[in-house]
Amino acid sequence: MSKTLYLVQSPFSATEQALSKVQNLYQSGDDVVLMGDAALYIQHTFIQQLACVFVLEQDAENIAAILSSNLETISYARFAELCLNHSRCISLK
């Protein structure tokens, strides 16, 4: 079981700061979901260093032109599974 699931749900203007917080807290085995405007930060240096970053299918439509090898688009059902498979979930807004 992974340890922490980070849900980055911040408005675009606050996403840089939210990702900085995640970067400071992130440990091996943790996962990150970019939601809403935060998905536009898919090319952020920290995000690119992750083996995998999750984006909801609806949010992925906004970044369709941006290719990222570590991006995994997920349905709401898969999102629910992710939440249940982690011992804690932290939302950054």
Model-derived features: where do they sit?
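Short, solvent-exposed amphipathic alpha-helical segments in soluble enzyme
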Residues: K21-Y26, Q48-L50
